[in-house]
């Protein structure tokens, strides 16, 4: 689609410096850059056996054209390795398309930062990141359920 390449380049060249600077004002429990293990691979490294994550699929930022590429099976071998590594610990709601699943396993060379923030500070931290031009979204962490991570759509 028109503008997809420009959007991808802008995303890949956005430095994580501002987000890192903002994070110094909050109680951060963990942080990782989302790179070769994809979003779900890195998330799985940040949480332990006592907790799980719940992600609202609508809130996941996706570059224009990425879903279409995945629908056309323009997939990477690394995404398949990531799926093989953590896929059995992820539960996707039945309405999540395969293309979105693939994007969450897809390795990124510059996928931004994933922070674990004290719950009471999460909203303020997110607003500050977004106010600085960031593309922050929230992942809900809860007591461990059946899977490491559930991808779905929260009720609106």
Feature locations, PLM:
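Helix-biased detector of long, well-ordered alpha-helical tracts
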Residues: 1-156
